[in-house]
Amino acid sequence: IDRRFYEKQYTMIDPKHFEPIVEGMWRGVNVGGTSTVARLDGWDVCGKTGTAQNPQGRDHSTFLSFAPKDNPRIAISVYVENGGFGASAALPIASLLEEYYLTDTVTRPWLVEMVKQKTIYYPAYGK
């Protein structure tokens, strides 16, 4: 992996603007919101679901997450074309990857099964 990915990157944006965003992402997972399935015992997970409209078919599913809240060890973004709502397709995938990365195990077999059984609609291409 390129060394640049191990180094903290800085922007020209004043860090004070990040605090309410991070807090909102933490609350979306831990207090209530569309991201509560992303909770992991012992970890302060932050996340945000998203749904991108798709005029050619089913909406796209997105989920952005990082953990722990203070001094993150992982940041992940999952985008599932035609996956529907962010919480229904992208979030479970991201959460399982995050859990495995942080803990070396998966403790939610029901979520693994849900991901395995999820049908993603792929429109016919090249008609």
Where are each of the predicted segments found?
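Active-site beta-strand/loop architecture of penicillin-binding DD-peptidases
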Residues: 1-10, 16-108
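Short, highly charged C-terminal tails/helix-capping segments
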Residues: 108-127
